[in-house]
């Protein structure tokens, strides 16, 4: 497993809207006798779906400043495909601590590792933790199959304040599943709005 990198220093606070994309890794192969769960790779279907997801995000001009991923092979592979498909040059962190982590650990990683001059972060993780955070922030029960991406916006002044509290709840903007926009279901257009690139 890779070692946990040093925590980045924080810059001055910003009032800009923060965008957080939470993704469950794409479909992975079953565990083989000679390998551990940590080493499981994506299936061909998982690779294809991730590439479709990257294309959808890219077509909407989504901007990503930082990628935070579990250090497991299937999450790193998912993050690699998203970065390549979106032609990203974002900062990248693969963290052992996020392997099968609970929801609060993903939330803490967003708060602890994002820099204040960054406006968007993309997080790739596992269930039940990543689904738990998506449902907690969305304040509703949602199905989170593999390769689901939930796009949230936060008006928090700093990344440290992004976590959900009684006075602050990140807003669910869009849900992508199977490489396509699954929510909201817009009756007037086939192309629901996603946060645009600044």
Segment roles from a protein language model:
Residues 111-122, 164-179:
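A polyampholytic, Gly/Pro-enriched intrinsically disordered region
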């Amino acid at each position: 497993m890779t070692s946990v990198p040093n925590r980045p220093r924080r810059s001055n606070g910003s009032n800009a809207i923060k965008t957080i994309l939470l993704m469950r890794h794409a479909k992975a192969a079953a565990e083989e006798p000679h390998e551990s769960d940590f080493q499981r790779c994506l299936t061909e279907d998982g690779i294809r779906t991730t590439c479709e997801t990257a294309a959808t995000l890219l077509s909407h001009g989504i901007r990503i400043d930082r990628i935070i991923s579990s250090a497991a092979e299937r999450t790193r592979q998912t993050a690699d495909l998203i970065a390549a498909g979106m032609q990203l040059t974002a900062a990248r962190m693969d963290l052992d601590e996020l392997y099968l982590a609970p929801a609060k650990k993903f939330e803490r990683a967003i708060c602890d590792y994002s820099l204040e001059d960054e406006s968007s972060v993309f997080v790739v993780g596992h269930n039940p933790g990543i689904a738990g955070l998506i449902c907690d922030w969305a304040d509703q029960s949602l199905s989170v199959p593999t390769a689901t991406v939930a796009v949230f916006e936060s008006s928090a002044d700093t990344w440290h304040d992004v976590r959900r509290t009684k006075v602050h709840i990140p807003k669910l903007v869009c849900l992508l599943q199977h490489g396509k926009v699954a929510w909201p279901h817009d009756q007037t257009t086939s192309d629901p709005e996603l946060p645009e690139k600044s």
